C-alpha cells in the first residue's frame, strides 16, 4: 500500500505543481497584461496632453489671427479716413478762396456768399467733431512738424520765431499731419 500511497502522493504533488505552475503562468500573464495596460494608460495621457497642446495652439492661433485682422481693419480705416480728410482740404481751400475773393470784389453781403460762409463753417465744425484740428494760428510758436515756412519777416508786433500770418491752414487728425500750415514767421 505504500507504493500506492506514494504514487497517489506523487500524483498529488505533480498535480499541485501543475496548479502552482499554472498559477505562476497566470500571474505572469496578468502582470504582463497589467504592464501593457499601464503603458497604454501612459500613452493615452501623452496623447491627451498632445491633443490639449494642439487645441491650445489652435486657440492661440485663432486669437492671433483675430487680433491681426482687427489691427489691419483699424489700419485700413485710419488710412481711408486720412485719405478722405485729405481730399476735403482742397474743398475748404476753394471755399476760403471764394470768401477772400468776395471781400476783394465787394460781394461779401450777397446771399450766395453767406451760404458759402455757412457751408464752410458747417464743414469745419464737422471736421472738428471728428477730431480734425486746424493748425497755423497767428502768434503761435513756429513748429516745423505742423508748419511749412514760406518766409521770414521782421515784425514789431510778433515775437521772434512766431507765426505772423497764415497763407494756408494746416490740418491734423489724431496726431497725423494731413497738411502743414503755410506760414510766415517773424525773424529775430
Curated annotation (Swiss-Prot):
GO terms for biological process: protein folding. GO terms for cellular component: cytosol. The keyword Chaperone applies. PROSITE patterns: GRPE (PS01071). The keyword Disulfide bond does not apply. Keywords: Chaperone, Cytoplasm, Stress response. It is found in: Cytoplasm. Pfam families: GrpE. One of its GO terms (molecular function) is unfolded protein binding. Coiled coil: none annotated. Its main location: cytoplasm. It comes from the Bacteria. Belongs to the GrpE family. Homodimer. Participates actively in the response to hyperosmotic and heat shock by preventing the aggregation of stress-denatured proteins, in association with DnaK and GrpE. It is the nucleotide exchange factor for DnaK and may function as a thermosensor. Unfolded proteins bind initially to DnaJ; upon interaction with the DnaJ-bound protein, DnaK hydrolyzes its bound ATP, resulting in the formation of a stable complex. GrpE releases ADP from DnaK; ATP binding to DnaK triggers the release of the substrate protein, thus completing the reaction cycle. This is Protein GrpE 2.
Amino acid at each position: 500500500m505504500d507504493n500506492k500511497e506514494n504514487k497517489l502522493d506523487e500524483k498529488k504533488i505533480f498535480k499541485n505543481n501543475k496548479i502552482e505552475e499554472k498559477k505562476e503562468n497566470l500571474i505572469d500573464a496578468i502582470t504582463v497584461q497589467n504592464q501593457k495596460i499601464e503603458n497604454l494608460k501612459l500613452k493615452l495621457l501623452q496623447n491627451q496632453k498632445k491633443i490639449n497642446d494642439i487645441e491650445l495652439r489652435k486657440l492661440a492661433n485663432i486669437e492671433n489671427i483675430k487680433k491681426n485682422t482687427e489691427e489691419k481693419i483699424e489700419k485700413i480705416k485710419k488710412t481711408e479716413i486720412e485719405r478722405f480728410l485729405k481730399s476735403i482740404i482742397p474743398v475748404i481751400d476753394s471755399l476760403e478762396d471764394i470768401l477772400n475773393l468776395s471781400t476783394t470784389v465787394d460781394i461779401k453781403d450777397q446771399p450766395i456768399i453767406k451760404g458759402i460762409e455757412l457751408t464752410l463753417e458747417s464743414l469745419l465744425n464737422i471736421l472738428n467733431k471728428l477730431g480734425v484740428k486746424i493748425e497755423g494760428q497767428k502768434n503761435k510758436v513756429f513748429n516745423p512738424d505742423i508748419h511749412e515756412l514760406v518766409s521770414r519777416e521782421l515784425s514789431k508786433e510778433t515775437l521772434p520765431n512766431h507765426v505772423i500770418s497764415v497763407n494756408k491752414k494746416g490740418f491734423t487728425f489724431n496726431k497725423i499731419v494731413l497738411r502743414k500750415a503755410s506760414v510766415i514767421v517773424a525773424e529775430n
